[in-house]
């Protein structure tokens, strides 16, 4: 049996609840009543306001005269905050002309129940819906005594999915389309059957067509959404935990990763691990349940941990950028970067994060905080001043600092890459030397460039083998220890300091240099190649891994991994180079002979794999022997038989226990040469460096007269020039290849910095723009889905950090492999620097 009903002014408001968590939304409420037939007057201003309001085709409220009434007023001139606060206490309206009580908000009551039923699809909720609607329909008024006048509905928040449900339900009640007698569930069933149709809400003589939206999601769709959300968020949490645990474990277990620069990386991993363990799980519960159901106390704890851990993670990125910048631009920073200094940086980062996170707990909250909790919304304090303070301290200022520092680092690396070009080598050319000496010097210099990837040997005590002359005219050549303290050179990489090896690290005695030229030996080439390799590594040490630093034996610092990884960045065919033992002996020093740690081959000493280059080096060695043989006959005072030496300057690289062994030409007959004695007879470059006076090799030769000596010397020099001329042709490609490498290194440096800064900006920028917009723009509405996406995108930065800050380090990669596959490093292992 159908019933007729009239709303008149009975409609107070529509107050609908989100089905999953009873989150309340204001959907609609009436404007001041229109004049009824008994002549009751209304305020002219309110009538004019009512006439201005209209509902668009898509259900949005529009002010036809652009009076902005929809933003200012909701009911009888009340502002939204006051109106919402009075909703819960508003009694059912009564007709002032009669004693008959009209229906008390039947549409609101039915809409609330319908929303609850749409969530659980439970029979009990459906019965409540049906009974509430039945009571509203059975409340009648005498249509003849009180003609019906339709209420004017002001529709608010029409983009909410449940708005059209409520309006559609009201239309069904008004149009008397449901038969409710004897069937409590018929209302719910009818709404499901009619979910996609159109219902006509009668408004006087006109009509408003409202399309009803889906009353309830299917059980399968609901479960599927929850399952997909749970799996995705669960995987993200798991990956974040595993990644950061691996970083922490690698630093703890690997001795070569235990250095002061990696302390910042470890602290960053701890902050990201807290995000994964304390913040993400509660956030996942919030997302799956679509509302905060854990109470206000836990909401305070969750928001505080969220701000604390995320702020600490971001500020650690700033600290790492500052550390790298100082390492690149300040040559003395490598000595002042102590454990205490780094720990102070970490302490400042966590202290700032605690201050920002605990400020709301000491009263810096907005007045609507508790009301949001009742609506099952858990958010950080929306106080405008706090949001400006928090977002600036947490993101905007750190963003500017990071961008500025990494831009400076990129400019420095780019400048050094372009400066690393072949330069003419100073040759100690005697006036009696033929013109062919200059060409010989150039060829050997080019060969030195080809040796850039050769890793020199190191000794257990860190001895450095050097060849130097006096400061006035001599040039220092040295094999720098792999464990020596590496400084970041701020001068051009191909130009070494004019001073000799630092006096603090030298224990050798320089022998005075004579006018004779130094003999260009293979060890000289290797030494120069070592210096070239060291300057190459410095150019982007702060770009690809941690900033370069060294190990000082007195304070127990471990060698950095930055130098080793940077060489991999800068060479297109890099290999991991292990340490090579070196035994240094000298007639001028008492350094003694140190027992080597391992066979050079077992330690993976890199040898030149290019057969052509090996052949060229063997030719140079043979040339050296011929020079030695030529210098053994007679007391010749001519230097024409000696080959032009490659002179360079020793870099200002202080070593831990470096021993500089001075070696200079004591005379034409006693010139000292530096050779590499092979420990592996199959390869001439794998062995220990020995410094010994050269003695004439015994050989049979016919006595020569003084008249024959010039001819023999000229013949020997001609043979030497012919031998070296065979090396010239392959060297013509060096410059072109070097330019290609420079462009590649520059692109790789830019790519690395773009990954570091780009990941940070992409992950956090949307969230912090939204966080600053919401309190400043009250009229701006951001959907819950978009807000959740931006929040979890920021959390995703904690997932990326362990990848970004370790993937460029080969030592971290090797450590991860050992952790995964159970490998272990030998006890005597020491990390060598490239």
From Swiss-Prot:
UniProt biased composition (Polar residues): 482-502, 532-542, 674-694
Documented effect of changing residue 657 to P: In strain: CA-130
The organism's place on the tree of life at top rank: Eukaryota
Gene3D superfamilies on file: Rhodopsin 7-helix transmembrane proteins
Positions on the Cytoplasmic side per record topology: 254-263, 323-341, 414-752, 809-834
Result after altering residue 213 to G: In strain: CA-015
Cell compartments where the protein resides: Cell membrane
Result after altering residue 49 to V: In strain: NC-036 and NC-123
SUPFAM superfamilies attached to this UniProt entry: Family A G protein-coupled receptor-like
Impact when changing residue 571 to V: In strain: CA-002, CA-003, CA-008, CA-011, CA-012, CA-015, CA-023, CA-027, CA-030, CA-031, CA-034, CA-035, CA-037, CA-043, CA-044, CA-045, CA-046, CA-048, CA-052, CA-055, CA-057, CA-058, CA-063, CA-064, CA-065, CA-066, CA-068, CA-070, CA-072, CA-073, CA-075, CA-081, CA-083, CA-087, CA-088, CA-089, CA-091, CA-096, CA-100, CA-105, CA-114, CA-120, CA-123, CA-128, CA-129, CA-133, CA-140, CA-145, CA-147, CA-148, NC-001, NC-002, NC-003, NC-010, NC-011, NC-012, NC-013, NC-015, NC-023, NC-024, NC-025, NC-027, NC-028, NC-029, NC-030, NC-032, NC-033, NC-034, NC-036, NC-040, NC-041, NC-042, NC-043, NC-044, NC-046, NC-047, NC-048, NC-050, NC-051, NC-052, NC-054, NC-057, NC-059, NC-060, NC-061, NC-066, NC-069, NC-071, NC-072, NC-074, NC-075, NC-077, NC-079, NC-080, NC-081, NC-084, NC-086, NC-087, NC-088, NC-089, NC-091, NC-092, NC-094, NC-098, NC-101, NC-103, NC-104, NC-107, NC-109, NC-110, NC-111, NC-112, NC-113, NC-114, NC-115, NC-116, NC-119, NC-121, NC-124, NC-127, NC-128, NC-129, NC-131, NC-133, NC-134, NC-135, NC-136, NC-137, NC-138, NC-144, NC-146, NC-147, NC-148 and NC-149
Effect on the protein upon substituting residue 51 to E: In strain: CA-002, CA-008, CA-009, CA-011, CA-013, CA-015, CA-026, CA-031, CA-033, CA-034, CA-035, CA-037, CA-040, CA-048, CA-052, CA-055, CA-057, CA-060, CA-061, CA-063, CA-064, CA-065, CA-069, CA-072, CA-073, CA-075, CA-088, CA-090, CA-093, CA-096, CA-100, CA-114, CA-120, CA-127, CA-129, CA-132, CA-133, CA-140, CA-142, CA-145, CA-147, NC-003, NC-006, NC-010, NC-011, NC-014, NC-015, NC-021, NC-033, NC-034, NC-036, NC-040, NC-042, NC-044, NC-046, NC-047, NC-051, NC-052, NC-054, NC-057, NC-066, NC-069, NC-071, NC-073, NC-081, NC-084, NC-086, NC-089, NC-092, NC-094, NC-096, NC-097, NC-101, NC-103, NC-104, NC-107, NC-108, NC-118, NC-119, NC-121, NC-123, NC-127, NC-128, NC-129, NC-134, NC-136, NC-137, NC-138, NC-141, NC-144 and NC-148
Effect the entry attributes to changing residue 143 to T: In strain: CA-064
Disulfide bonds, paired cysteine numbers: 299-378
GO biological process terms on file: adenylate cyclase-inhibiting serotonin receptor signaling pathway; anesthesia-resistant memory; chemical synaptic transmission; G protein-coupled receptor signaling pathway, coupled to cyclic nucleotide second messenger; inter-male aggressive behavior; male courtship behavior; phospholipase C-activating serotonin receptor signaling pathway; regulation of circadian sleep/wake cycle, sleep
Outcome when changing residue 588 to M: In strain: Berkeley, CA-009, CA-010, CA-013, CA-026, CA-041, CA-060, CA-063, CA-066, CA-086, CA-093, CA-113, CA-137, CA-145, NC-006, NC-008, NC-021, NC-064, NC-067, NC-123, NC-142 and NC-150
Biological role: This is one of the several different receptors for 5-hydroxytryptamine (serotonin), a biogenic hormone that functions as a neurotransmitter, a hormone, and a mitogen. The activity of this receptor is mediated by G proteins which inhibit adenylate cyclase.
Name of this chain's protein: 5-hydroxytryptamine receptor 2A
Native source species: Drosophila melanogaster
